[in-house]
């Protein structure tokens, strides 16, 4: 099934506490709590969630958010139209490199999650359109692994400027001009989310994506190694399961693939300078659960139970905004 102990708990006990929900699934972070006071006009007059079913509440909260989201998108589109009109009227349209992208994707209810900060497809993948008819053939589609660190080098390259050696990314100008992936181009994309359980109850995680598979490691702690959630691994076959509904990490048929992706992930972390040396307390947790043997899994189960107790105590005390990204909390996990 989808997810892991990191996103569901040992026996699904953490489903109410991981990730912002549309309806009331997550009692700390959900749009049914947050949106009615902010946008009362998007809900029925004198709205009280107690008078509606969970299904209706979820629908109302989801639609309220989606309307706001799409209005933002429409605002961007309208202003892009103004810009393009100006470029056309001044004769600069075909002499201008237009790059349309975003800093990340966005969850709009998939897995009952909202916002970004996940390595799942809807959040990790970004829109990327490039127009420059002088050298890019209209309708060109490339399927190369491109990351946001590649944007800067590409812009400099297209402007005829030298790309500094200090920049991590590589120019994909040749991809755009030829429609083909150059030999030796990277075959993976790297992902890291570190603000553990801060804005939308997202556990800290790191991972790697190829064109066909994705490996996610939820190490589940802040930079001080504290506020732990259960560590867990997830593997998805994007060619057969594009919506990431079946975690294949424990499937024996994928053991060799898991080992290879872990090797690539470790190498990538070193290559990009995210090897954990700057935050040794967090890296200690990362390494502790890297192999994920029986002992690791048993400890993850205990962490899941301990986190549930902590979260329930916080909710009972009326604490919604907990300082999760810093500090270390002592735990009672036996060695």
What spans do the regions from the language model cover?
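Short amphipathic alpha-helical coiled-coil/interface segments
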Residues: 261-265
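Short beta-strand segments enriched in hydrophobic/aromatic residues
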Residues: 102, 132, 219, 280-281
């Amino acid at each position: 099934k989808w997810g892991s102990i990191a996103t569901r708990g040992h026996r699904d006990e953490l489903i109410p506490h991981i990730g912002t929900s549309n309806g009331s699934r997550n009692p700390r972070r959900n749009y049914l709590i947050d949106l009615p006071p902010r946008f009362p006009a998007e809900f029925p007059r004198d709205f009280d969630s107690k008078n509606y079913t969970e299904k209706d509440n979820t629908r109302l909260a989801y639609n309220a958010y989606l309307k706001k989201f799409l209005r933002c998108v429409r605002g961007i589109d309208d202003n892009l139209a103004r810009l393009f009109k100006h470029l056309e009227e001044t004769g600069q349209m075909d002499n201008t490199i237009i790059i349309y992208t975003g800093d990340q994707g966005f969850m709009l209810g998939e897995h009952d999650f909202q916002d970004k900060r996940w390595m799942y497809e809807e959040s990790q993948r970004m829109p990327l359109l490039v127009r420059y008819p002088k050298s890019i053939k209209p309708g060109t589609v490339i399927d190369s692994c491109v990351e946001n660190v590649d944007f800067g080098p590409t812009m400099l390259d297209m402007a005829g400027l030298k790309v500094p050696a200090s920049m991590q990314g590589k120019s994909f100008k040749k991809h755009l001009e030829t429609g083909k992936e150059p030999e030796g181009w990277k075959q993976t994309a790297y992902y890291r989310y570190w603000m553990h359980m801060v804005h939308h109850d997202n556990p800290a995680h790191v991972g790697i994506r190829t064109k066909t598979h994705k490996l996610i490691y939820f190490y589940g702690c802040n930079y001080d190694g504290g506020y732990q959630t259960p560590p867990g691994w997830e593997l998805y076959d994007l060619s057969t399961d594009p919506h990431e509904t079946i975690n294949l990490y424990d499937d024996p048929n994928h053991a060799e693939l898991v080992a290879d992706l872990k090797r690539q992930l470790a190498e990538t972390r070193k290559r990009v300078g995210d090897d954990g040396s700057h935050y040794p307390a967090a890296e200690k947790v990362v390494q502790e659960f890297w192999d994920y043997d029986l002992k690791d899994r048993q400890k993850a189960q205990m962490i899941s139970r301990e986190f549930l107790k902590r979260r329930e105590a916080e909710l009972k005390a009326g604490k919604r905004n907990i300082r999760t990204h810093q500090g270390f909390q002592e735990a009672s996990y036996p060695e």
